[in-house]
Amino acid sequence: MPTEKRQRQKEGRAARQAALQAYRRKAARRRQLITGVAVFAVVVLILVLLQRGKDNGQNVTAGSSTTAQGTTATTAAPAGKVGSSPCPPADGAAPRKIAFDGEPSPCIDPSKTYTAKFETDVGTFTVALNAKQAPKTVNNFVFLTRYHFYDGVKFHRVIPGFVVQGGDAAKGDGTGDAGYKFADELPKSVDEYKAGSLAMANSGPNTNGSQFFIVVSDAGGKQLQKPLYSLFGQVTEGLDVVQKIEADGTPQGQPKVLHQMVKVTITET
């Protein structure tokens, strides 16, 4: 009898051990399933955020024909829709305005010369605007500048050797614009982009708004590969100031230091 009792105890222990191991295997499978679902959810979330970033960022891209257009809180007016805001006075007396219901009506005289002076937190640089080659784009820039649109706006995207980008007064992170789009005025060749070139950021044909970029080197101009961005100006003085801003950029575009346009003014002669 003692032998049979020990045998039953042994069998009981074996059964309990087997049940425990089965439970542990089941629990491990459950944890793996939960972990797999969680990982899948995280991957989906990342993909959604990346896609949202593509949809909302207005970035010029090296080595690519694609860019991403920012959206404001309101739907941007399509290219060709003229807004209701009048041409601001040339003396800078207009109050600041950063949201519009359509592109500007003609406010400049293409036969005249227009110069933009950028006062930044690290110095001043000057750009000669090319109203003959890009009258619509220069008109847009002069219009926004005379409404003080760019005053205090940061250079939110800076890539060393490539571009310094700014012009988002609405959100400040590259996902905003002035509330409208307008048509392209493209150069004939990518060779026209060079150190100091001023061009518009976009998300494809005829999606210009308020954001622009400055090419920081001739090699940076070559990275654009195709003439897909409206070219409307050239830095004539203070390229070293632009390069100071460039120096605080990163390969990913997020600046180590956020520099800003303190004030931008237009001279007409």
Question: What are these model-predicted stretches?
Answer:
Residues M1-T269:
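Cyclophilin-like peptidyl-prolyl cis-trans isomerases
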